[in-house]
Amino acid sequence: MKLFSNYDRLVSFVSVHQAVLAEEALNQAGIAVLLIPTPRDLAISCGMCLLFSQLTQGTVFEIFAKQNILWSKYYSCQADKRVYEKLGEYKGG
């Protein structure tokens, strides 16, 4: 599915509220994201996650830290092929 081909990172959240806050913050920063239901293959978190590009990864997590957005886990992904590799977990802070 070409729609997801530009998105190679997926981040899950501790709540739907945090997912929506993250989407709004990243949209305001001009970062392209897609808020989607968490893929069944991952069965984690609140049920919502964001897809974004690896090219924006540093900025994404800087915004999360500055705005106290609580995320759960993040993955590299080929969303169109349903292939996910866990890269990290939120450690708090």
Question: Model features per residue range: what roles?
Answer:
Residues 2-5, 42:
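Solvent-exposed alpha-helices and their adjacent loops that cap or buttress functional pockets
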Residues 24-27, 81:
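Charged, amphipathic alpha-helical interaction segments
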Residues 4, 46-48, 84-87:
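Short secondary-structure transition/capping segments
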